């Protein structure tokens, strides 16, 4: 896959107002190359949505942000939520990350985007096109990386509420505490929405109009809690640990006599996530970091009506997804004009699904490297490669070559990158 892009960058005069504009136009990004650099200096085609843009637009959820600000993304509502598409490809070929770590947990094959809390977002970086050389499986249509803020004030408490039609209500609470070397961030969010129909009528097989209970958008209630701690042991060594809990219950209409549609049960989703890591800064341009993240995502049916062996109020287990990922990554500035990245990654996916008689886990072991160099103050080049070994699908080599040439205030970019998708455990 190849692409060429050009862009113009404004240069502001000195002054407070101009500085604000410059920051908005040229933020620091990390998704395109795996290293922090200014947006105008990265050879990768990255789009950025800043926290200020999200705030000005009154955006409270991930779908709103993507729909309003990223033309290459679209969402199609269905019975189980929203179906994401990017560059014409389904969400199975889009990798969604939070601070560089994969978001897991799906509803009928669609990533459950409602578990993404927008209250802490610093910026959202969208990388168009294949990026498997850095991120591995699924990064074919593109990568969406949600970067969150870290606590800065000694004590900060914020709350926000939102109410719109269809009884859609959102309440968020955030508490930051930063004291010397230790910082804490706590967030809680509650969401609720009624279900709704375009019409209460449908056409049956005889072309007659009949009443229906089927909804275009299903009602739900959701709780999302997260906690993060950071500790700066020295100027060079830092640690972090985080965890979260996610709960969501649909609110679907029960079956009624004389009407089509309706359901015997609601669907309950519950997830736990945890992570920890450390970073050691060798110097201003070199560092080594170790990260681990785990996730346990479960779905169940909660019956409203008697069906088979189940009575109202009974739960039926349907699926559990577990995810473990450990990554060791080094970033090195061997010369003043180059940056080199090396990394190894171990990932374990586990699926328990009784209806398909699946109770299995598969691992993926990966190694990758990338070298970026700037020449003659106008040309930047990147060469990278990644090798993934999937327990069932075997090995896969993924290359990447990118270049950027500066012509005054214009950048011309060219990229060749490959992408692949390893089969899921259920596949």
Locate the predicted segments by residue:
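Surface-exposed extracellular loop regions of Gram-negative outer-membrane beta-barrel proteins
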Residues: 192-198, 244-253, 288-302, 337-349, 355-358, 391-396, 403-427, ...
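Short, acidic, small-residue-rich periplasmic hinge/interaction motif at the N-terminus
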Residues: 11-55, 91
